[in-house]
From Swiss-Prot:
Keywords: Carbohydrate metabolism, Cobalt, Cytoplasm, Isomerase, Metal-binding, Xylose metabolism. Binds 2 cobalt ions per subunit. It comes from Thermotoga neapolitana. Belongs to the xylose isomerase family. Its cofactor is Co(2+). This is Xylose isomerase.
Amino acid sequence: MAEFFPEIPKVQFEGKESTNPLAFKFYDPEEIIDGKPLKDHLKFSVAFWHTFVNEGRDPFGDPTADRPWNRYTDPMDKAFARVDALFEFCEKLNIEYFCFHDRDIAPEGKTLRETNKILDKVVERIKERMKDSNVKLLWGTANLFSHPRYMHGAATTCSADVFAYAAAQVKKALEITKELGGEGYVFWGGREGYETLLNTDLGFELENLARFLRMAVDYAKRIGFTGQFLIEPKPKEPTKHQYDFDVATAYAFLKSHGLDEYFKFNIEANHATLAGHTFQHELRMARILGKLGSIDANQGDLLLGWDTDQFPTNVYDTTLAMYEVIKAGGFTKGGLNFDAKVRRASYKVEDLFIGHIAGMDTFALGFKVAYKLVKDGVLDKFIEEKYRSFREGIGRDIVEGKVDFEKLEEYIIDKETIELPSGKQEYLESLINSYIVKTILELR
């Protein structure tokens, strides 16, 4: 089989002193940490849409990407070429997982029946390639946002026919995700929301969204799909106000409709910042709710108001992200999927590799720093001391439900002073910096 990236060698770990852009500096996939290889802690995944479908187009300019599969003019030939390129790409980067939307991997036909037949052919190609590879499917999903039929939404559309089409599309996407051994299935509601309340029945749309998700849960049970269902929150873009705004909003929705036991969250860094949160905030919320499922790894540009999907290169952010993952017990049916694209001017094939290497190194280093933070317990000790007043005396009585407003008033009414601990934010932020530097210095 012809190579798509003949000029790119298999990427190796060369250590922190390496200046080779096509080598890992911090990510050694076989390095054992806490009893298992680093690759199993991180579970890196390639996003099919950004890596093999994105062409560098933007609202102001034509495609710029120079991609070897673009020499194919027949849509099916191009689809098969992209699949073959995926496996070569993953194997050269030592990435064991990939994710896709149904419409990423196969073109649409004139009817859903025809589209499904086309999709089946591409799935067969993927299955054939899987036989000779260790590359696996992390999660699948359906594209319910690109086609004009979804202009009013999919599960929240005003058209019963569109609702039916979306349901049938998810049905098929669930089937192929199961067929390919996917560990999870993602629901992202890019068109599930509104532009204005003047033409929106908000209550009805939310009820229909719940009906849709309940149907998906029921169908997954009927076909024996045991993968993890994941909601991917995002506050806006492409829709002005999206119903899965953030973890707290989406969890409240799931809880109020009795769906919370079936779903966890796929947290994307750039979506968190669009919602006015830090990446760590969304991960922490998901963790304390017991709903941290998977991560879409990227970063945004805080000076811009849209989802830039850049490769993650901020070690401070990845440290705090992996801190939450480790505290949650690590990934089970989830991982780190690079929902990231090279910049429009980074148009060469090697840039695809360099971008992934940068992200993998950044998360590997972040994991190593976070592991030391968790192991040393420095943040836990500080937080424990900060809330010490609730482990003794009146604080303990509050926690144990032994007091009410009257008793608390009686306790406090004659106290002249209250002593408070310092938050020491500056110290803790500098402590993270120290751990990052210390970790780098200790690496070979």
